[in-house]
Amino acid sequence: MTNIRKTHPLMKVVNNAFVDLPTPSNISSWWNFGSLLGLCLITQILTGLFLAMHYTPDTTTAFSSVTHICRDVNYGWIIRYLHANGASMFFICLYAHMGRGLYYGSHVFRETWNIGIILLFTVMATAFVGYVLPWGQMSFWGATVITNLLSAIPYIGTTLVEWIWGGFSVDKATLTRFFAFHFILPFIILALTMVHLIFLHETGSNNPTGILSDMDKIPFHPYYTIKDILGALLLILALLTLTLFAPDLLGDPDNYTPANPLSTPAHIKPEWYFLFAYAILRSIPNKLGGVLALLLSILILALVPMLHTSKQRSMMFRPFSQFLFWVLVADLLTLTWIGGQPVEHPYVIVGQLASILYFLLILVLMPLASLIENKLTKW
């Protein structure tokens, strides 16, 4: 008798994706982040669901409803902080996953890569609207500043901003719709993740060497299920350590002050995971130019497959490209640091130089290094 997992219409799909999936035998721990992102998403949806049961999306009660969750709801404090720090873990895994893709040439799978970029935008949108919900000072002013950027769009800008706000400023209508968006977007992310996996399973996984591994595949279960469980345990350990020992480490103290439209915080800045993009936005002294640079800083990822000039897929055997990749990582860390600093000397010039280097590395230096490596290896 054939095994039910191979014949049942639903179990067959799960089996082909997570049990009998032929997987390269040499994929490293950098390949763990995909499953960790899935775990983060499920955690965020579950904690978010329980928070939504007690939260009220109204300007007069939003802040106090979050306080109520932390003080009066059974284990509300841990649910709230797991959700807030879970977002940070989500972005850590996301950036590691993207870095892995960039380093080992996963962008050669065009469809998977492009769905990944759409997923990144969706996750960023979800995190942004979610940050507005506690209705603290940074929530309010963050929403005001970021939505206001759309007013830089010629002709329709102002109308567009007021349409998003649902009025002439960030107010009750804005909060209500942001809550609605924050509730629906994770399910859109879930659907897009399915599409991401469908495209990935069309080609099979890449591996550290970047060489076709069809002749050396092993079943996903038990080899990679056990490896993923280890990764998951380490992620849960990190999340719980952060949540239980330093829940506010990555947050902003200003968000413990209720939103006040009449008082602007000294330094308006987003959460840490958006600081690199915020630094790029601020490094251009023109509103429209800054907005375009902000968009391009992420959209540039869509150009990466077209800029892949190397004859080898992975950077594993390409020392010049490896060096530039780590320069890019250092540059992004520098931008993240600058994004959290006030707009004054020397931070302004450092931010501008780091922004120029970011675009220069991806558009010019890395493709050029690949061509030089081709020449040196007489490929």
Curated annotation (Swiss-Prot):
<dbReference type="GO" id="GO:0005743">
    <property type="term" value="C:mitochondrial inner membrane"/>
</dbReference>
<keyword id="KW-0349">Heme</keyword>
<keyword id="KW-1133">Transmembrane helix</keyword>
<comment type="subunit">
    <text>The cytochrome bc1 complex contains 11 subunits: 3 respiratory subunits (MT-CYB, CYC1 and UQCRFS1), 2 core proteins (UQCRC1 and UQCRC2) and 6 low-molecular weight proteins (UQCRH/QCR6, UQCRB/QCR7, UQCRQ/QCR8, UQCR10/QCR9, UQCR11/QCR10 and a cleavage product of UQCRFS1). This cytochrome bc1 complex then forms a dimer.</text>
</comment>
<feature type="transmembrane region" description="Helical">
    <location>
        <begin position="113"/>
        <end position="133"/>
    </location>
</feature>
<dbReference type="InterPro" id="IPR036150">
    <property type="entry name" value="Cyt_b/b6_C_sf"/>
</dbReference>
<feature type="binding site" description="axial binding residue">
    <location>
        <position position="97"/>
    </location>
    <ligand>
        <name>heme b b566</name>
    </ligand>
</feature>
<dbReference type="InterPro" id="IPR005798">
    <property type="entry name" value="Cyt_b/b6_C"/>
</dbReference>
<dbReference type="InterPro" id="IPR016174">
    <property type="entry name" value="Di-haem_cyt_TM"/>
</dbReference>
<dbReference type="GO" id="GO:0045275">
    <property type="term" value="C:respiratory chain complex III"/>
</dbReference>
<dbReference type="InterPro" id="IPR005797">
    <property type="entry name" value="Cyt_b/b6_N"/>
</dbReference>
<feature type="transmembrane region" description="Helical">
    <location>
        <begin position="288"/>
        <end position="308"/>
    </location>
</feature>
<feature type="binding site" description="axial binding residue">
    <location>
        <position position="196"/>
    </location>
    <ligand>
        <name>heme b b566</name>
    </ligand>
</feature>
<dbReference type="Pfam" id="PF00033">
    <property type="entry name" value="Cytochrome_B"/>
</dbReference>
<comment type="function">
    <text>Component of the ubiquinol-cytochrome c reductase complex (complex III or cytochrome b-c1 complex) that is part of the mitochondrial respiratory chain. The b-c1 complex mediates electron transfer from ubiquinol to cytochrome c. Contributes to the generation of a proton gradient across the mitochondrial membrane that is then used for ATP synthesis.</text>
</comment>
<comment type="similarity">
    <text>Belongs to the cytochrome b family.</text>
</comment>
<dbReference type="InterPro" id="IPR027387">
    <property type="entry name" value="Cytb/b6-like_sf"/>
</dbReference>
<keyword id="KW-0249">Electron transport</keyword>
<keyword id="KW-0496">Mitochondrion</keyword>
<dbReference type="GO" id="GO:0046872">
    <property type="term" value="F:metal ion binding"/>
</dbReference>
<protein>
    <recommendedName>
        <fullName>Cytochrome b</fullName>
    </recommendedName>
</protein>
<keyword id="KW-0812">Transmembrane</keyword>
<feature type="transmembrane region" description="Helical">
    <location>
        <begin position="347"/>
        <end position="367"/>
    </location>
</feature>
<feature type="transmembrane region" description="Helical">
    <location>
        <begin position="77"/>
        <end position="98"/>
    </location>
</feature>
<dbReference type="InterPro" id="IPR048259">
    <property type="entry name" value="Cytochrome_b_N_euk/bac"/>
</dbReference>
<feature type="transmembrane region" description="Helical">
    <location>
        <begin position="226"/>
        <end position="246"/>
    </location>
</feature>
<feature type="binding site" description="axial binding residue">
    <location>
        <position position="83"/>
    </location>
    <ligand>
        <name>heme b b562</name>
    </ligand>
</feature>
<keyword id="KW-0830">Ubiquinone</keyword>
<keyword id="KW-0999">Mitochondrion inner membrane</keyword>
<feature type="binding site">
    <location>
        <position position="201"/>
    </location>
    <ligand>
        <name>a ubiquinone</name>
    </ligand>
</feature>
<feature type="binding site" description="axial binding residue">
    <location>
        <position position="182"/>
    </location>
    <ligand>
        <name>heme b b562</name>
    </ligand>
</feature>
<dbReference type="InterPro" id="IPR030689">
    <property type="entry name" value="Cytochrome_b"/>
</dbReference>
<dbReference type="Pfam" id="PF00032">
    <property type="entry name" value="Cytochrom_B_C"/>
</dbReference>
<keyword id="KW-0679">Respiratory chain</keyword>
<feature type="transmembrane region" description="Helical">
    <location>
        <begin position="33"/>
        <end position="53"/>
    </location>
</feature>
<keyword id="KW-0813">Transport</keyword>
<keyword id="KW-0472">Membrane</keyword>
<dbReference type="GO" id="GO:0006122">
    <property type="term" value="P:mitochondrial electron transport, ubiquinol to cytochrome c"/>
</dbReference>
<dbReference type="InterPro" id="IPR048260">
    <property type="entry name" value="Cytochrome_b_C_euk/bac"/>
</dbReference>
<keyword id="KW-0479">Metal-binding</keyword>
<feature type="transmembrane region" description="Helical">
    <location>
        <begin position="178"/>
        <end position="198"/>
    </location>
</feature>
<keyword id="KW-0408">Iron</keyword>
